[in-house]
UniProtKB/Swiss-Prot annotation:
Motif extent (RxLR-dEER): 48-63
Coiled coil regions in record: none
Record bears the keyword ATP-binding: no
Cleaved signal peptide residues: 1-18
Free-text function comment from the UniProt entry: Secreted effector that dos not suppress the host cell death induced by cell death-inducing proteins.
Domain of life: Eukaryota
Family as reported in the entry's similarity comment: Belongs to the RxLR effector family.
Taxonomic lineage of the native organism: Eukaryota, Sar, Stramenopiles, Oomycota, Peronosporales
Stated name of the protein: Secreted RxLR effector protein 128
Record-level GO cellular component terms: extracellular region; host cell nucleus
UniProt note: domains: The RxLR-dEER motif acts to carry the protein into the host cell cytoplasm through binding to cell surface phosphatidylinositol-3-phosphate.
Amino acid sequence: MRGAFYTAIALLIGRSQTAKEIDQTDVSKPYLNVVAIGGKGTKTTPKRYLRDGLAHSATNEERVKANVLSKDAMDLAAEGKDWLSLRLGTVDHSHTPQLKRKVDRLPAITQRRIEKKLTTAKQRVYDRQVKLDDPRYPEYLEMHHNFLDIPKMPPGMSLAEAVVMYNMVNWQSGSIPTGKKATNHLSHLAGRSPLRDVNKALDPTFVAKASEDQLRNAYFVKLQIMYAKVYDFCHSNGCTKKELVSPLEQKVEAKETKLLLPLFKN
């Protein structure tokens, strides 16, 4: 009786060893990845069966949370759907997707910055723009005409240039043509003027050959010559602003001054 029991135990041990040897030689699925038993969100470690049949725990870098992948996939799918709707023109304006709002907002900001850059330089051309609705426009026209008649005045003085120089003559200080203030003002005018206005003020033959820097330098020299003529003319004839008490008016007595520029008619 006891011998039969030992014989049965030996048979069971032999069978288990044979099954283990067969399982180790089975390489039909050497790269099968399985996850140990455990629910979602648990700390169960995934395991991998390698060629040698031994199970090894995955490293921390190999662990991937399913909920993170799911969220990224959903966001990508939503953005793709919005983009496709925009391309096909099927988006209702009352429910504009977030992607469309981001895409439309950037060009608008860029366009405003570009327009500001383009208009800033033009707005700085002259300190005072001459307009037809200016109440002193008729006076400026007559003053401009008289400036053109100044002896040896360079040709082509514009109305805007005449008004700028007329204002410079009546500065409370720094109106001398060779002074730093007047020189900087004329240099600013030459550098900020539209190139088409610069070309009109210069000889066409020179304009055809010169670079932009050469054109603006030549225009600056011409402005200096014109202002020197205007300065001498106004200090000899008293062409000053009626509403200001300038140094010129303090030097010249009104009774002894013969006004060649009838700007202040009553």
